[in-house]
Design a protein with these regions (language model features):
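Hydrophobic positions on the alpha-helical face of helix-turn-helix-like DNA-binding modules
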Residues: 157-158, 168, 172, 211
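Alpha-helical transmembrane segments of integral membrane proteins
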Residues: 239-281
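Glycine-rich helix-loop "coupling/hinge" segments at transmembrane-helix boundaries
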Residues: 193-217, 255-256
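Juxtamembrane inter-helical linkers in multi-pass membrane proteins
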Residues: 156, 164, 249-267, 304-317
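Membrane-water interface segments at the C-terminal ends of transmembrane alpha-helices
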Residues: 1-25, 35-148, 176-197, 221-242, ...
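Short glycine/proline-centered loop/turn elements that form peptide/ligand docking sites
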Residues: 150-153
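Glycine/proline-centered hinge or cleavage motifs at structural transition points of membrane proteins
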Residues: 161-163, 175
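Short hydrophobic, aromatic-rich alpha-helical segments embedded in or entering the lipid bilayer
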Residues: 27, 203-213, 292-298, 306-309, ...
């Protein structure tokens, strides 16, 4: 009974949106299929596909490098690589715009070191970059956990048969972590289609942007867009649940009688790829974690110095917090 009540409570907003679309002044079918409705839907799906695909590749690569190779300091990297999750996308996007623009502290520090980081973060490219950097941990965390728990027998057999590490990864490891990659990618997809702050700052109009913009003067269109967003989210959630259950069943079949985690995961020596791998991990952490932190620290220091000079200090009340 409790589950039914909870489900009904969550279904009420969706039912209200559908009722408003059906009872609107325009034909629901014409409204849902009009170019002004489908255009933001296409942009949203385009951005979500790009972000989820990039996050899948980046998160999987980082998970493999930090859990299955002899990367220098990999225990440290395993701690800091998922930390960009602490930044809300809106805060991260604002920090990027401020820090990497000419005159920003990160831009100026890089210029002093001989690097040119001048870039205009806006539109599809800016939204894609920011959302990828702050959502790849949704792929990294489940993939890293899966890599750490895989039985080593399959990989050992492949190596004994003469397969190189890259071939072992593609033929043995990747099929076993595929469900984790797919589930994490769908979470990134869902996060992207529901995001408002980052796309707003990047001036890229998606469903959430258009819903907010049309909520006062074109409510029929606003509710139609909200219904599309709701249906898209439900499809993604259903797909994620299906893939997670299928992955659990596949994992049980693959492991069989083997005890998961009974031996340490095999370590792949990086060799000549040690420097590029370290550069990849350090570069991602620098962009996604350190760069926004520097910008936020610069904002805080600027506010403190302003208050010391007699200016208005930065104040927050409960309305701002809540």
């Amino acid at each position: 009974m409790a589950a039914v009540l909870v489900a009904a409570a969550f279904a009420l907003p969706g039912g209200y949106v559908a009722w408003r679309v059906i009872g609107g002044t325009e034909s629901p079918l014409a409204l849902l299929t009009s170019p002004r409705t489908l255009s933001p839907l296409w942009r949203t799906v385009q951005l979500a596909v790009l972000v989820s695909a990039t996050a899948a590749v980046l998160g999987t690569a980082l998970a493999w490098v930090t859990t299955r190779t002899d990367l220098v300091g990999r225990r440290f990297w395993r701690v800091v690589v998922p930390l960009p999750l602490v930044y809300p996308s809106f805060v991260g996007a604002a920090a990027f715009i401020s820090g990497l623009s000419p005159g920003g502290i990160v831009h100026d520090l890089a210029a002093d070191l001989g690097f040119d980081l001048t870039m205009r973060l806006h539109g599809l490219t800016g939204a894609w970059l920011v959302l990828t950097l702050f959502t790849y941990p949704y792929v990294y965390l489940p993939v890293a956990a899966r890599l750490a728990s895989l039985p080593t027998a399959f990989e050992e057999n492949a190596r004994l048969l003469g397969d190189r590490p890259a071939r072992v990864f593609s033929r043995v490891v990747l099929p076993q972590i595929g469900s984790s990659v797919a589930a994490g990618s769908l979470l990134v997809f869902l996060y992207t289609v529901s995001d408002f702050g980052a796309v707003h700052l990047m001036r890229f109009e998606t469903l959430t942007q258009t819903i907010f913009r049309t909520r006062l003067f074109d409510r029929d269109r606003s509710f139609a867009l909200a219904l599309l967003l709701l249906v898209l989210a439900l499809v993604v959630v259903a797909a994620e649940r299906t893939i997670s259950r299928a992955g659990a069943r596949r994992g049980a079949l693959l492991t069989g009688d083997a005890t998961v985690g009974d031996r340490r995961a095999l370590t792949v020596p990086l060799g000549r790829w040690a420097a590029p791998a370290t550069g990849l991990v350090a570069g991602v952490v620098g962009l996604a974690l350190v760069s926004p932190a520097i910008s936020l620290a610069d904002w805080g220091l600027f506010g403190w110095m302003r208050s010391r000079r007699g200016g208005a200090p930065l104040r927050l009340d409960w309305d701002d917090v809540l």
